[in-house]
Amino acid sequence: MPKKFGRIHLVVMDSVGIGAAPDADKFFNHDVETHEAINDVKSDTIGHISEIRGLDVPNLQKLGWGNIPRESPLKTIPAAQKPAAYVTKLEEISKGKDTMTGHWEIMGLNIQTPFPTYPEGYPEDLLEKIEEFSGRKIIREANKPYSGTAVIEDFGPRQLETGELIIYTSADPVLQIAAHEDVISREELYKICEYVRSITLEGSGIMIGRIIARPYVGEAGNFERTDGRRDYALSPFAETVLEKLYKAGIDTYSVGKISDIFNTVGVKYDMGHNHNDMDGVDRLLKAMTKTEFTEGFSFTNLVDFDAKYGHRRDVEGYGKAIEDFDGRLPEIIDAMKEDDLLMITADHGNDPSYVGTDHTREYIPLVIFSKSFKEPKVLPVGHFADISATIAENFSVKKAQTGESFLDALV
């Protein structure tokens, strides 16, 4: 069957959820002060930002963000009388609310065994191996779930004095190593992270979803994380649609941390890591306007919504970031060809008004736009992997483990 769209561009607004998922009662955040576990049933990332701060997003509104099915309408994003895009929301079936699980399911995998997390910190034998390899001691007090900004505030001054490593985790299946660039170079930090990755793979006795290098600079009281972040992920456990496209000879472009999330599997052209989300949009536009990119798939992650504002529970910053992205949408649409398809979605929620600091179990919004559409409408509620099933059908490759294509509905 001839392809309907020559190029498909998928943009993940990291953590921009649109209301609690049906199984949100099984997922929890912990009150920072009382440590009480509160389920995610009342989470609603877009809804609460729209209600508390307000959102001025004329471009997303025209596309139909306000038309996405909800129990109550978005306070400051009215439904469009004639939305310019197909819209819906998608439910996750995998047993996790982390970045890897969300992205892997979007690409067609069904993760029923959640990645292990380490709420009590990492075991002593692992820390000792890292110390032996690196020749540096580890600050044991940091070895627990920690906010990335708080951990360098609390232990950065000590690291500047002693050169010890700051190793911490979160509610996600990650091991993060923070290193001040004046004390531990990026090159050294990356080597340590590569070593930790090599000893924490599946079957090693302690499996970790991602190892993350977190370089930072500055002085005590004014530390700032840099754009030198690197993620060392596991390779997907099964073949994703991204990999199927690559193997079929279809050009695949990654923007932002997509290449890290999939451990480069299925990525032909990596446009690099984003300095920030606006830089990420610039990199997407650079890919879209490449003369050689005539057919294929681009996959973009914009992480600031999550990393800078969601985890820090910054409603104002989060709302401003959404508005900034909305302001760039005309450029993205202008760069589209007549037979391009643009899909804008998320990978989980991270309600900045919610208790705790963790992701929230939510539906994700889906906007589907092409200049060729005649009368777009609201689609039935689906599942994350429907995105990749649609991409797979368009490019005549087999879908992955799960997902139902909605390609025929796009006219």
Swiss-Prot record:
It is found in: Cytoplasm. Its EC number is 5.4.2.7. Binds 2 manganese ions. InterPro entries: Alkaline_phosphatase_core_sf, DeoB, Metalloenzyme, Phosphopentomutase_DeoB_cap_sf. Its main location: cytoplasm. Keywords: Cytoplasm, Isomerase, Manganese, Metal-binding. Mn(2+) 2 binds at D306, H311, H359. The keyword Cell membrane does not apply. GO terms for biological process: 2-deoxyribose 1-phosphate catabolic process; 5-phosphoribose 1-diphosphate biosynthetic process; metabolic compound salvage; nucleotide metabolic process. It holds the Pfam family Metalloenzyme. Isomerase that catalyzes the conversion of deoxy-ribose 1-phosphate (dRib-1-P) and ribose 1-phosphate (Rib-1-P) to deoxy-ribose 5-phosphate (dRib-5-P) and ribose 5-phosphate (Rib-5-P), respectively. Belongs to the phosphopentomutase family. This is Phosphopentomutase.
